[in-house]
């Protein structure tokens, strides 16, 4: 869904990145163990794929220069996974709608799309990085299928309502 107050930004602009780096410093100073970077797939709407890799890598470098064990978890944008610099920058990856909902709420994604995403995600598990998959099934049958396929691929799954208002 379109979340109220959620909108794309020109993440490749230095002024915007300065804001994020300032927040990263505050997060570190507060003592959090890491950050969960949502909307990493924004490059799919705006272009600038290489700039997104660079941005995530810069966030990671800044954070890890202050605390080596600080976690960087990226959500979505699995087209970035083949990039070695991106893989090096992140500690874990989360993917929404791997099996259902890519094109229409509750609709099964194409076999080709699933196969390609799984191939990319397994590049991370081969490096020992956890992969989380969040599915928003419409019914119990979809939930059951999603649990099985997520488990079969050795991913960590969450079945939830899209509103994320309950676990």
Task: Describe each PLM feature range.
Residues 1-167:
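Glycan-processing catalytic domains of CAZymes
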């Amino acid at each position: 869904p379109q979340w109220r107050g959620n909108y794309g930004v020109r993440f490749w602009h230095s002024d915007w990145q300065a804001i994020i780096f300032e927040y990263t410093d505050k997060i570190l100073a507060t003592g959090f163990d890491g950050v969960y970077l949502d909307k990493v797939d924004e490059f799919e709407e705006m272009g600038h794929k290489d700039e997104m890799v660079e941005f995530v890598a810069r966030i990671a470098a800044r954070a890890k220069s202050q605390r080596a064990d600080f976690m960087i978890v990226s959500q979505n944008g699995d087209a970035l996974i083949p990039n070695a610099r991106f893989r090096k920058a992140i500690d874990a990856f989360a993917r929404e709608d791997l099996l259902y909902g890519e094109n229409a709420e509750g609709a099964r994604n194409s076999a080709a799309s699933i196969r390609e995403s799984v191939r990319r995600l397994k590049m991370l598990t081969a490096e020992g990085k956890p992969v989380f998959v969040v599915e928003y099934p419409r019914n119990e049958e979809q939930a059951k299928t999603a649990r099985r396929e997520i488990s079969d691929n050795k991913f960590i799954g969450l079945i939830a309502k899209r509103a994320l208002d309950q676990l």
